[in-house]
Amino acid sequence: MSLVLDSSVTLAWVYSAEATVAVSDVFARVIESGAWVPALWRLEVANVLEMGVRKGRTDAAFRDAALADLALLPITVDAETDRHAWGATAKLAARYRLTLYDAAHLELARRRSLPLATLDPELRAAAAAEDIILIGA
C-alpha cells in the first residue's frame, strides 16, 4: 500500500545521519509501493536543501544529488492540492492549529485513505485524531 510522505521524513532520509530505522523502513515502502505528496512537497524539500547550502551544512553537489535521488523514486505529486486548499485543507489547519502546508499532507492522506509518514508531532497528533494510520516514527 502506498502512503503520504511529508518533508520531515524525506529530509531525515536525505540527511542520513538523522535517519532512524523507521525512516529507512518508510523509504523501503516508498520504493516498493510508491508514495503520494501534496503539490508543495518538492518546494519544501528543495527549500530546506537550498538553505542547507546557504548555511554551509552541505554543498550544492549534495543538494543536487539528493534531488536527483528523490526524482528517481515512485512519488506521485497530487494534482488536486490547490483545489482543496481553501476548503478541506484550511478547515483541517484551523481545527488542529496546523500550518496549511502540514494540513495539506493531512488532507491528502484523508482524501486518499492512505497512511501518513511524518515526524512532525503536531501533524501526527492531528492524523491520530482523524484516525489516519501513522508511520515513520
Task: Map each language-model feature to its residues.
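Short, well-structured N-terminal submotif of metal-dependent ribonuclease cores
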Residues: M1-L40, G52, R57-A65, E130
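Acidic, PIN/NYN-like endoribonuclease modules and their adjacent C-terminal/linker elements
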Residues: S2, L106-A137
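Alpha-helix capping/helix-boundary segments
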Residues: T10, W41, H84-A85, H105, ...
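Amphipathic alpha-helical protein-protein interaction surfaces
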Residues: A19, R97-L98
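Short beta-strand scaffold positions
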Residues: V37, L100-A103, T118
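Acidic catalytic patch
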Residues: A39-R42, F62-A94
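Entry/capping segment at the start of metal-dependent catalytic domains
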Residues: V45
